[in-house]
Every structure is written in C-alpha cells, then in structure tokens.
Amino acid sequence: MRILVVDDDRAVRESLRRSLSFNGYSVELAHDGVEALDMIASDRPDALVLDVMMPRLDGLEVCRQLRSTGDDLPILVLTARDSVSERVAGLDAGADDYLPKPFALEELLARMRALLRRTKPEDDAESVAMTFSDLTLDPVTREVTRGQRRISLTRTEFALLEMLIANPRRVLTRSRILEEVWGFDFPTSGNALEVYVGYLRRKTEADGEPRLIHTVRGVGYVLRETPP
C-alpha cells in the first residue's frame, strides 16, 4: 500500500514516514497541496494523509479539487484545531476521516487501517438495497437516498449509516460502533463518533425530514422513527 503524506512541517512528515514505513507501507512525501496534486496526477497512491494548514494550497482545497473530479482517494485529514467547525469543514470538503493534532502514532495507524479496510471492493457482491422508513442504502453501489433525494456520504459516514440501518430499532453501544466502523476504540475523551453522528444527521435531515438517528444517553445510538 502506497501512502502519500502531505504536511508543510518537515518533522511531522519524517515522523509519519518512519512510522508508516515501519508498519509496512510505502510512503511518499509532499510539502504542500500543489505538490500533492501533481504527485497524485502522475502516480496515484492508495491513500492520502493530509494536513489542513499549508502554504500555496491548503488541505481542504486539495480535498475539494480531488472530489470535484470524482476521485474517491481515501483521505485522512490532520488538523491542529479540534473544533466542530474545523471538523465539519474537513468533512464538507470530502475527507473520509480526521485526526486532531497532537495525535498518537498508534491512533493514526489504526485509523489508516480502518480507512483502507473500508475501501476494499466486494468482489461479485450482489446489490441488495437496505431500507428503513424513506431512507435507502445500497452497500454495493454505495448510493444513499432519503425519499427521492440523493445523499452524498464519505466512507466513514457510509459505514456508520450502514451499521445503523442493518440494525433497525436496536440500540447500538458507543463501543460497538467504534469497534465495527473504525476497527478500534477511541480514547474515552474523544468525541469523533458524536461529530460523525451529528454530520450524518445534517445530511439525512437536510430537507427537514424527521430525525431517524437518535441518541440513547449513556449508551449509544438507535435508528428508529420516534425518539426512545
């Protein structure tokens, strides 16, 4: 697997190169968004680790340009500001996952493994749509609709919704969701799951549709027509 690491901080680039290489990845480095896009165009990697704040062309614009051309390259965004608006901006731009700085290398590696696992194609799989209320998800074509409205989701959002729609009206614990969607458990202080649930709600309720994804306080989440 070839990973392109893009960060204007040389120390960060080298640290990630060493860690990813040690864990069996082939790693290439770029110092800003312009160089990254040139490298992707000439020899597309399997995944992208992308800093947000960079000179010339920032990470969010790199995401937007790739997604605007239909490129679904897996993207893990690194952000120095762990605010909701910053994370939403990354997801809006098309990132599949985000990781706030400073981060543990073990967590970055775990997220990368989970992201690459979600990108593996299902050979010879039949397209069987999953439906709950007026929400439909096709796990093979990756199409999602609410009524007649198409919904565009990142890989992480899709995996989260797929788990919920596969377990209708069943309360799913936070730890189970983290394990199944991300492949590992976040630190208990992390609120990544809450951010993704919130963003998924925004997309599935964009036209004022009734809420289907509900919080079960102290436990997790459930997909149902009415609040628990």
UniProtKB/Swiss-Prot annotation:
InterPro entries: CheY-like_superfamily (IPR011006), OmpR/PhoB-type_DNA-bd (IPR001867), Sig_transdc_resp-reg_receiver (IPR001789), WalR-like (IPR039420), WH-like_DNA-bd_sf (IPR036388). This is Response regulator MprA. Phosphorylated and dephosphorylated by MprB. It comes from Mycolicibacterium paratuberculosis (strain ATCC BAA-968 / K-10). GO terms for biological process: regulation of DNA-templated transcription. Gene3D superfamilies: 3.40.50.2300, 6.10.250.690, Winged helix-like DNA-binding domain superfamily/Winged helix DNA-binding domain (1.10.10.10). PROSITE patterns: OMPR_PHOB, RESPONSE_REGULATORY. GO terms for molecular function: phosphorelay response regulator activity; transcription cis-regulatory region binding. Keywords: Cytoplasm, DNA-binding, Phosphoprotein, Stress response, Transcription, Transcription regulation, Two-component regulatory system, Virulence. The keyword Oxidoreductase does not apply.
